[in-house]
Amino acid sequence: GHVMQTATGSARTFEARDSAADTLARLRGMDADALWVVYHDYAGLGRAKAVPRGRFEEVAREGVTFAMANWDLAITDEQVPHPIFGADSGDFRAVPDPSTLVALPHRPGVAQAFSRLTDDTGAAWVGDPRARLVAQVVRLDALGVAVKVAFEAEFVVVQGTDPEALHSDLGRMFAVEGLDGRWSMGARILDDLDAVGVAVHQFAKEYGPGQFEISLLPADPLRAADHFLLARQLIRAAARAEGATASFMPKPFADVAGNGLHVHLGLTRADDPNVDLVADRDDASALAETAGPAIAGLLAHAAGQSALASPTANSYKRLLPGSWAPAHVSWAIGNRAALIRVPGRGAGRHLEVRGGDAGMNPYLHLTGLLAAVADGVEKHLAVPPPAEVDV
């Protein structure tokens, strides 16, 4: 357990010893009537079972049971071709992770937790996306690299179910009117995220009709992915409360701006968070030594990574040349058409990965990104020259 303890606080999740007692204590403190135990499948869909107060003790310890065959379901709930898990493949358990327990602001009396996944025997299950992410955090830690992650998500809000209603929305990019027209929803989102401990950087009207963007503050990778999924859930609920629908679909309408999910990666020295591994300490316009191999690793694995970052057919309707979304594998210092962008100067400098959308499972996307960074650092990969034109 020592390595995990030192690599990241969130890795303690996967040390099951004290988690049941911790879960129970927190549930009692919340005075919850029901607990929603949630895991996210490979399509990034939250799946859950609700348990009543009388079963809290048992579920805190044992978790809830799901059929392994659930992993074969696509985002449409159709079984994928050539499924890995048959009807005879048994069960897995979702055990509440106490560090993720929240009281749902829009559902009084309901507590919710994300999960550690185990097999029938209670041993950690190899297919758990959260555990796979923690393993890459530990790998980078051994290379002397610590990572902070911030998600930036776009979504569209449609009133009722009429897509034509979208086009009557006149709020322009960052327009005050756009923000004002939806402020009861915006205020609800900010209040609810604050209540569950998700730290927001900013919320704004985006380019497309009915389109908004929310940026979250940096956190360790596991926490950042947890927070994005919680934010997505609460944003959808806030829109529903206003009689509207919030959609994170990559390209919901052909002629309207698509929705991206950008990932910002900050790299520091594992033993000294004050040493930035992206920005050069002495030259604000230069990159630090580790940034080159990190970017090279991200580019080397970009094609494979797209299966994790933008996993739906709809994703590729967004990723077109000339669309401000990355259609090619490239990197640049400021260019917003590049796949890997290096925004910021000095201490604020970091890596922004622009290819993804909310059809992803963010744990798997981050697992792939961190593995690519680790590969670049381990192999001392050389970074190609930056692209400075709109690609």
Describe the predicted segments one by one.
Residues 178-182, 186-189, 194-200, 214-221, ...:
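Accessory "access/gating" subregions that flank catalytic or transport cores
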Residues 225-233, 238-249, 257-268:
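Loop-centered beta-sheet repeat module
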Residues 3-202, 224-227, 383, 391:
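ATP/Mg2+-dependent ligation/transfer catalytic cores
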Residues 113-119, 212-218, 265:
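Short, hydrophobic beta-strand segments
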Residues 41-43, 118-124, 178, 218-224, ...:
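A generic structural motif
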Residues 5-13, 18-25, 230, 244-245, ...:
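Catalytic-core signal marking the mid-to-C-terminal active-site face
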Residues 148-159, 166, 196-216, 246-262, ...:
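Core alpha/beta catalytic barrel or barrel-like domain that forms the active/cofactor pocket
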